[in-house]
């Protein structure tokens, strides 16, 4: 694969962060793959991997063109720094923990690939409840949103229904292939 943005998408609770972290560990020091850090207008919580920023800081970065990608979901702003565009131009893959709704709104591009992390609905519900981040009403909203966004066109799909190592290896194989 030549330089590209790799958007890893899937419903909340599908294990995107865990699958990405597993693949990252398996790839080691592979210089052709860069894992972008998301910026989110939310405090860091256990199990999340992002750089927190305030809403005014987000708006300032947006106004000066420092964001390559940005979207809104679940009441928060998410963003990827413009600095990663240089990696894509240099022929590297830049892995982004993205949003299904955002990716569906993007125009087709030869340097954009979508990887879908899928998971059975009953596992999603259990994982969302277990992490304790959301109220039961918010969990129900996330599950309903998942039903609305099931038709994501993806270039590759990783099933994360059982063994995390298997899912991580599947993503690592795609990124290194």
Set out the residue ranges of the language-model regions:
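Hydrophobic anchor at the beta1->P-loop junction of P-loop NTPases
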Residues: 8
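Conserved phosphate-donor/acceptor-positioning beta-strand/loop module used by diverse small-molecule
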Residues: 95-98, 108-130
């Amino acid at each position: 694969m030549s330089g590209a943005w790799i958007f890893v998408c899937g419903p909340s609770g599908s294990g995107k962060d865990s699958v990405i972290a597993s693949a990252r560990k398996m790839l080691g020091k592979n210089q052709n793959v860069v894992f972008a850090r998301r910026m989110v207008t939310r405090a860091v919580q256990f199990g999340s991997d992002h750089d927190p920023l305030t809403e005014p800081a987000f708006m300032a970065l947006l106004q000066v063109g420092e964001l390559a990608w940005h979207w809104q979901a679940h009441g928060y702003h998410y963003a990827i720094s413009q600095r990663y565009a240089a990696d894509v131009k240099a022929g590297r893959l830049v892995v982004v923990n993205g949003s299904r709704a955002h990716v569906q709104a993007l125009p087709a591009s030869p340097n954009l690939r979508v990887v879908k992390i899928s998971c059975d609905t009953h596992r999603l519900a259990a994982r969302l409840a277990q992490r304790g981040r959301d109220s039961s009403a918010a969990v129900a909203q996330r599950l309903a949103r998942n039903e609305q966004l099931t038709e994501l066109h993806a270039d590759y799909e990783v099933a994360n229904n059982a063994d995390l190592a298997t899912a991580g290896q599947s993503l690592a194989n795609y990124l290194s292939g």
